[in-house]
Amino acid sequence: MRLHRLRARLNAVAFGLLLLLVHGQGPEIVQPEVDTTLGRVRGRQVGVKGTDRLVNVFLGIPFAQPPLGPDRFSAPHPAQPWEGVRDASAAPPMCLQDVESMNNSRFVLNGKQQIFSVSEDCLVLNIYSPAEATAGAGRPVMVWVHGGALITGAATSYDGSALAAYGDVVVVTVQYRLGVLGFFSTGDEHAPGNQGFLDVVAALRWVQGNITPFGGDLNCVTVFGGSAGGSIVSGLVLSPMAAGLFHRAITQSGVITTPGIIESHPWPLAQKITNTLACSSSSPAEMVQCLRQKEGEELVLSKKLKSTIYPLTVDGTVFPKSPKELLKEKPFHSVPFLMGVNNHEFSWLIPRGWGLLDTMEQMSREDMLAISTPVLTSLDVPPEMMPTVIDEYLGSNSDAQAKCLAFQEFMGDVFINVPTVSFSRYLRDSGSPVFFYEFQHRPSSFAKIKPAWVKADHAAEGAFVFGGPFLMDESSRLAFPEATEEEKQLSLTMMAQWTHFARTGDPNSKGLPPWPRFNQAEQYLEINPVPRAGQKFRETRMQFWSETLPSKIQQWHQKQKNRKAQEDL
């Protein structure tokens, strides 16, 4: 009898062990599956801190064919269908880039860095959808375009799970070709340029045809992006190629009118690139053919091209005219727009990436003028007038710290603040609802990596928009587990504002801070733990760039004209 009981007990233990082997010691792993027009995908399910809501995550879904071989430098082609179930549970490779150049991005928040493998076969997107979202549920869709100066970045660096869970939206993060592969242009049919921009357009087309089974509303799509991603988003508003593909837009510290982000005459840069890569030719066709035969790594790892900027191109099709001309003529898509900047844009992250930190700390007037000359030239400021611009910021200050702060303020205005305010005014005057913000909070995590004088650095708001304090995967670049209670609340508020704007075209809702519309009075929201409405953002400086400086330049040109007339007598 005792032997019988022992056998029964051993059998029970064995059965229990079998159950543990089959099911594991934790909850059963859920692998959600969804049918797209191209085939079935299997993702994974994740949790989010502070809520019981689960999120279905699908990574690396192709929206276009791999741009390889003869398709290098070409517009993207629609992805091909697949058989069976495609695994969409692992992070996809980043688009081919110099991984070393991506190191600077670890200083966005707290020193974390996510490096994924790289590949030219990278035209994929990630989807984060609330687990209870069913086909046809009709949740707002938010499509994120990452930044990185158009040369670095990855969709998977932006974990959309917290934003999806707390905002009850479907988040899509997209990848696009970068650097020479994404933006090389000969200015003609052989390499028109803008292929990285067209990748984003192709992703938006894919969303229109496939987002419904993931619980998204194809008639409620918001494009949003930060830094260079913001430049692409604002370009989507101006480009006829993106008509009807989205319904609202958000830019964070970047617009297409930023100096150097778009070029009307790409040929000189094409010559520089091909000369460096031993593909020099007077024939654009031969140039492109030579570049197509190169290994991808050779194109992106050339040390001689390390500091090269690869801009968008005014090609007559994607961008029929320059952005400034399009803004003045108002032929663009009139959609609700939320846009803004941070209060210390050029403080540390960008100067570090540009190798200017040491120079900045010992800045002289001559240094400031030399560094500023290229950008002022691109803004059509005559060399004789450039000292006037420097004096506006530097004044009579001789103190090293004052010069450093003046340089930071100048560069932040030129590259981000002035273009963003100008863009918002054009949108407002076209009749588009516009909501403007200045993010003013210094993340507590900066104490580990940045000097105490750095305030809200470039891209600092991203961790709050994406719910960094609530991300379960603490290795994620925007994960912010050390956030204070005050910062957690700020993140919850910003997620609610961004997603309510995506839902309605207005960031105002019950329980949220009042956010005035950017109209002729130019009111905006100062975002920090105690938000308040502001008016006439940086009024004196904005007036200098929009009125005072143009007037002085006009007077200078008139004097030159009069002098020449006198000399001709």
Swiss-Prot record:
GO terms for molecular function: carboxylesterase activity. Keywords: Disulfide bond, Endoplasmic reticulum, Glycoprotein, Hydrolase, Serine esterase, Signal. N-glycosylated. This is Carboxylesterase 3. PANTHER family: CARBOXYLESTERASE. Disulfide bonds join 95-122, 279-290. It comes from the Eukaryota. One of its GO terms (cellular component) is endoplasmic reticulum lumen. The gene is CES3. Its EC number is 3.1.1.1. It catalyses: a carboxylic ester + H2O = an alcohol + a carboxylate + H(+). The active site is at residues 227, 345, 458. A motif (Prevents secretion from ER) lies at residues 566-569. Belongs to the type-B carboxylesterase/lipase family. It comes from Pongo abelii (Sumatran orangutan). It holds the Pfam family COesterase. Transmembrane segments: none annotated. Glycans are attached at residue 103. The lineage of its organism: Eukaryota, Metazoa, Chordata, Craniata, Vertebrata.
